[in-house]
Amino acid sequence: MKKYLIMFVALLALVGQANAQRCLPKMKGIELKANMADGFHTSDKDNSAGYSFGAALSSYTKGGNKWVFGAEYLQWHSPYKDICIPVSQFTAEGGYYYKFLSDARKIVFFYIGASALAGYETVNWGDKLLFDGATLHARDRFVYGGAITLDMEIYIADRIALLANIRERCLWGGDTKKFHTQYGLGIKFIIN
């Protein structure tokens, strides 16, 4: 009887759900994101809000922190009379994100990160002459700066996570706005 009791207790110790090991050092993931910039983008001609799309490679370090390297396309609009003049930025990013909160089951993670950004800004796709004969004085230029990001990951499977983020970008060197607030959603695929 004692033998069966020990076996029963051993079996009970093995019952339960095993959680996946997430955010281990050297794990890598591919992130795809879509954001709104400076408000909510609509077709209204007085709306200067825009949107952005990005892709990044994230590599985890000790403690679940991560390095992020990626590229992003951001477009916003500058209202002028009855039209909106497009301003586009193509940027590369490199940054470090610190995990400051996660749940015990390692499903939800919160990060705060800082990134360096560099890229190119184009106003009206380089076309200086407007429909009414006015000339744009803003030029296409290289831009540089940084971003601060608050990021959330929610794992829906062992290798798939949903992302939500809010970030503030500041870029110098261009002839247009320096600061852009972005918020959006994304998805991450763990690749190793």
Model-derived regions: residue spans:
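Gram-negative (and chloroplast) outer-membrane scaffold detector with strong preference
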Residues: 56-131, 189-192
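C-terminal segment of classical bacterial N-terminal signal peptides
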Residues: 13-19
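Predominantly the C-terminal beta-signal and adjacent terminal strand-loop region
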Residues: 76, 148-192
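Residues that define the transmembrane beta-barrel architecture of outer-membrane proteins
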Residues: 26-30, 47-53, 84-92, 108, ...
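Extracellular loop and loop/strand-boundary signature of outer-membrane beta-barrel proteins
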Residues: 40-43, 79-85, 132-138, 170-174
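Sec-dependent N-terminal signal peptides
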Residues: 4-13
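Short glycine/proline- and aromatic-enriched beta-strand/turn motifs that initiate or cap beta-hairpins
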Residues: 20-70, 74, 188-192
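Short coil turns and loop connectors of transmembrane beta-barrels in diderm outer membranes
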Residues: 3, 16, 24-28, 63-65, ...
